[in-house]
Amino acid sequence: MRFDLHCHTTASDGGLSPKELVMRAENMQVDVLAITDHDTTAGIEQAQASAKHLQVIPGTEISCAWHAFDIHVVGLNLDIAHQGLQQQLSLQREKRELRAQEMGRRLAKAGIDGVYQQAKQLAGSAPITRSHFANVLVERGLATSFNKVFDKYLSRGNIGYVPNNWMNIGEAIETIHQAKGFAVLAHPTHYDLSNKWIRKLVSEFAELGGDAIEVAMPQMSKDQQQWLASLAQQHQLCASQGSDFHHPSTWRELGRGLQLPDQCQPIWQRWQAL
Ligand code: AMP
Ligand code: MN
Ligand code: MN
Ligand code: MN
């Protein structure tokens, strides 16, 4: 069975519609696909309606504040009809909107006008993310690549960055649990944290009642995966895997390059056992 438990659609900052994403995943022989758009579950129904043979797991990726870092917690196997979940996600989207407006003001002060308006147009009805800003800035030739825009304008310490006020990790875990889901710490090695801070993060996540951490992601060294697997084991956390697919590209594909080390307890066994 091929599992991919982390990906994005046009319901947040992905390039493919939920239907296109599901069709692509089916072509890639994915059996179980979790749709995990940023702070929304809006793409789930269309994805489920489009699936012919794969199973769609309802999910979301919640932005959290932790010591001034943006940390992402993925919720899997959610009851998306749960009101408390939808209320919390709606609050997050309001924060996104206010942050985006402030990002626009800060960029304008630095002489870069009208970025918020363009980013908003790109996002349409989806929650507005820094990816939308990044696309606008690249389009205007202000940086040579999507990644460089973050280094130059959008990541912490740069002119377009606005300190976050997302919910905290405990609140995200609680929200996910109330909606009968499982809480997964997303991509622990992608936050620009030292190993010491990653250990602290995983340990706190476990203490707060988190269920799993992502251990297998594309382009990760075996050593890194082994290290995350041992951290999970140490804190009695399950393991998850996902591509974090946003757009078709040469180095990231749905369901590819994902395999958990043997000692891991796959998170999907938890809902399969229900
Ligand atoms: P936001 O949740 O609005 O802060 O936007 C975060 C999204 O921007 C992430 O989910 C990624 O898709 C993208 N992103 C964040 N940081 C980077 C980075 N350094 N390089 C490329 N993409 C990034
Ligand atoms: Mn994203
Ligand atoms: Mn993320
Ligand atoms: Mn993601």
Feature map (PLM): residue ranges:
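Extended substrate/RNA-proximal surfaces in nucleic-acid metabolism proteins
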Residues: 50-203, 258, 263-265
